[in-house]
Curated annotation (Swiss-Prot):
Transmembrane segments: none
Compartments, record wording: Lysosome; Melanosome; Secreted, Extracellular space
GO molecular function annotations of the record: aspartic-type endopeptidase activity
Keywords of the record: Aspartyl protease, Disulfide bond, Glycoprotein, Hydrolase, Lysosome, Protease, Secreted, Zymogen
Gene Ontology cellular-component annotations: extracellular space; lysosome; melanosome
Gene source species: Sus scrofa (Pig)
Record protein name field: Cathepsin D
Cysteines joined through disulfide linkages: 46-53, 221-225, 264-301
Gene designation per UniProt: CTSD
Record-stated family: Belongs to the peptidase A1 family.
Prodomain positions: 99-103
EC number(s) given by UniProt: 3.4.23.5
InterPro entries from the UniProt entry: Aspartic_peptidase_A1, Aspartic_peptidase_AS, PEPTIDASE_A1, Peptidase_aspartic_dom_sf
Its biological purpose: Acid protease active in intracellular protein breakdown. Plays a role in APP processing following cleavage and activation by ADAM30 which leads to APP degradation.
PTM characteristics: N- and O-glycosylated. Undergoes proteolytic cleavage and activation by ADAM30.
Length: 345
């Protein structure tokens, strides 16, 4: 049957779960990221200057009986940080890490090629609560054409249905923080029925978006645009000029790097934002599209919409990140190449 993987939620901004690599399994926390296609974790061979490496779990190939050396070098670039190291090798990936302990039958994906990261520049990965990233997008965007974990999982016939589904809890204090269901759909996490939207380009989980309406006054993505559904992005990302207009409409103040803040007392009176996909309307209330961020006793309210340019050939694209997925339970269907959405329970 389907395998549930429990996720932890850190401040509504990072969702991650535990996997094992090697025999016996070495445990790592990873972001299950539908916006990329590679798996990487920090390496025991990381450079001394790599601070991110000091504070995270590290893979030691010498301790695994199923390790196969590969050694090709690689570099991966994300929206927020880049990473270089070497394409380590092949080994067995277990989800969850120790299935015997969790009482759920887990799965083991054999001969999975992944990256052992030896260099992680910048602050991006130091602040991360997770060790690595497990990409769940299509093979087309996999660096070095490595076969992604879910593709290997399908080929090894480890699930009955070639689908996986995400529930992301938007209450940072509540348990569980979320759930990734491999090979199925967990009906306890949504209400009503699922509506499906066809993938328009099999690279990211890309679908067609009809429009984004802010209250009754402003329409963005007029005449339609393309959007990707991305569990690895915290916010909803749009083109800078469109998000600037949206910011004006909701009284948001530009912060840095395309992010905006909103005076917390204004949040309850802000208009709904409605995303239309395939003729279905997906409403987000101001409570859904704002994030409360507390630091040093101060609470600020961050807009859930961020402006960022995604240039051709991939872009221009909107990104429907955790702000959206938290409100709408999401099914990623590799069998029929479609994305299913229903209101999260």
């Amino acid at each position: 049957g389907p395998i549930p993987e429990v996720l932890k939620n850190y401040m509504d901004a990072q969702y991650y779960g535990e996997i094992g690599i090697g025999t016996p399994p070495q445990c790592f926390t990873v972001v299950f990221d539908t916006g990329s296609s590679n798996l990487w974790v920090p390496s025991i061979h990381c450079k001394l200057l790599d601070i991110a490496c000091w504070i995270h779990h590290k893979y030691n190939s010498g301790k695994s009986s199923t390790y196969v050396k590969n050694g090709t070098t690689f570099a991966i670039h994300y929206g927020s940080g880049s990473l270089s190291g070497y394409l380590s090798s092949q080994d067995t990936v277990s989800v969850p890490c120790n299935s015997a302990l969790s009482g759920v039958g887990g799965i083991k994906v054999e001969r999975q090629t992944f990256g052992e990261a030896t260099k992680q520049p910048g602050l991006t990965f130091i602040a991360a609560k997770f060790d690595g990233i497990l990409g769940m997008a299509y093979p087309r965007i996999s660096v070095n054409n490595v076969v992604p974990v879910f593709d290997n999982l399908m080929q090894q016939k480890l699930v009955d249905k070639d689908i996986f589904s995400f529930y992301l809890n938007r209450d940072p204090g509540a348990q569980p923080g979320g759930e990734l269901m491999l090979g199925g759909i967990d009906s306890k996490y949504y209400k009503g029925s699922l509506d499906y939207h066809n993938v328009t380009r099999k690279a990211y989980w890309q679908i067609h978006m009809n429009q984004v309406a802010v209250g009754s006054s402003l329409t963005l993505c007029k005449g339609g645009c393309e959007a990707i559904v991305d569990t690895g992005t915290s916010l909803i990302v749009g083109q800078p000029e469109e998000v600037r207009e949206l910011g004006k409409a909701i009284g948001a103040v530009p912060l840095i790097q395309g992010e905006y803040m909103i005076p917390c007392e204004k949040v309850p009176s802000l208009p709904d934002v409605t995303v239309t996909l395939g003729g279905k309307k997906y409403k987000l209330s101001s409570e859904n599209y704002t994030l409360k961020v507390s630091q040093a006793g101060q609470t600020i309210c961050l807009s859930g919409f961020m402006g960022m340019d995604i240039p051709p050939p991939g872009g221009p694209l909107w990104i429907l990140g955790d702000v959206f997925i938290g409100r709408y339970y999401t099914v990623f269907d590799r069998d029929l190449n479609r994305v299913g959405l229903a209101e999260a329970a």
